[in-house]
Amino acid sequence: MDFDKQLFFNVEKIVELTEQLEKDLNKPNLSFEQIKVINKELKHKQPLIVKFKELQKLVENANEAEQILNNSSLKELHEEAKKELEKIKASLPSLEEEIKFLLLPVDENNQKNVIVEIRPAAGGDESCIFLSDLFNMYKNYCTSKNWTVELNEIIPASVGINFVSFAVNGTDVFAKLKFESGVHRVQRVPLTEAKGRVHTSTVTVAVLPQLEEVEITINPSDLRIDTYRASGAGGQHVNRTESAVRITHLPTGIVVACQEGKSQFSNRDKAMKMLRAKLWENAQNKQLSTQADLRKSQVGSGERAEKIRTYNYPQNRITDHRIKLTINKLNTVILGDLDEIIEALQADEKKQQLEKFIS
């Protein structure tokens, strides 16, 4: 039977190495960190091992069927073996495809929590109003996933919101929300438009993985930390306590601020998480600048023509331009029903990875 023998050989080697890792767990004097790393690797490889065992079984059954076809003179056995072989040949390509997907490199940040920042771009007041709509959309989506949302900073505008930063904690958060980074364009009639004309506005979204202290080293001497009075809604904390925190990373000039926590300690902790995420983004951008396929930064310039997604209210249509996906249910998407779009983006990511893997 024809099957991808090189694929079989490669996975067989991986399975052997995984079995060795299982044996290593029984070694004495392993540190907690070593055990943690091994268990993480075993968990990651488990789906591949399951599929490989399925492939092994198919190959064994195919070999048995071929032996019967070549050696048996009994017509009944011959027909049964022929049917079995046809069944195996039909199921083999999809199984090999699944295994190839499982061999693809996994983004090490997929399991991480995130920090999301949304800013208005082109469109004035309408951009600030749309920013507020997107913020509510993400909050609803996070609720549907049983994720928690923690507000870091919010700056109100005369209408809508001028800036918002929030953390999202849960399972596989970056794996899903990372696709939201970029320019989001809205086409609709603003509430302030007397003549009923459709306006186009944009906001930028940045999704950054939250990194642990061990992943990003920050020298305390590189930081300037300022405290100030938080300006909560309705005058909360105003002129009462300097609980808000602003941190400046002197080597890069990156500034982060947090005032939504109840204490200076809480705000400082959140601000440090934001800073680690910003430094990661800064390092990523430097790395990208050295590559041949240099692309623009995560959110781009915010120009109307530079967009990842368009929200067309008059036609109840939402289009993701990266994968040319159009669905006519903007009314539910804007309330947080993002699954169809995000799942399509994840599938496209896997497809592109597989094409690179094969080539």
Swiss-Prot record:
GO cellular component term, pick one: cytoplasm
InterPro entries from the UniProt entry: PCRF, Pep_chain_release_fac_I, Pep_chain_release_fac_I_sf, Prokaryotic/Mito_RF, RF-1
Intrachain S-S bonds: none
Domain of life: Bacteria
One function term, GO molecular function aspect: translation release factor activity, codon specific
UniProt keyword terms in alphabetical order: Cytoplasm, Methylation, Protein biosynthesis
Record Gene3D superfamilies: 3.30.160.20, 3.30.70.1660, 6.10.140.1950
Localization (cell): Cytoplasm
SMART domains: PCRF
Keyword Protein biosynthesis (UniProt): yes
Record note on modification: Methylated by PrmC. Methylation increases the termination efficiency of RF1.
Pfam families: PCRF, RF-1
Modified residues (N5-methylglutamine): Q236
Family: Belongs to the prokaryotic/mitochondrial release factor family.
Function, in words: Peptide chain release factor 1 directs the termination of translation in response to the peptide chain termination codons UAG and UAA.
Name this polypeptide is given: Peptide chain release factor 1
Originating organism: Mycoplasma genitalium (strain ATCC 33530 / DSM 19775 / NCTC 10195 / G37)
Gene name tied to this protein: prfA
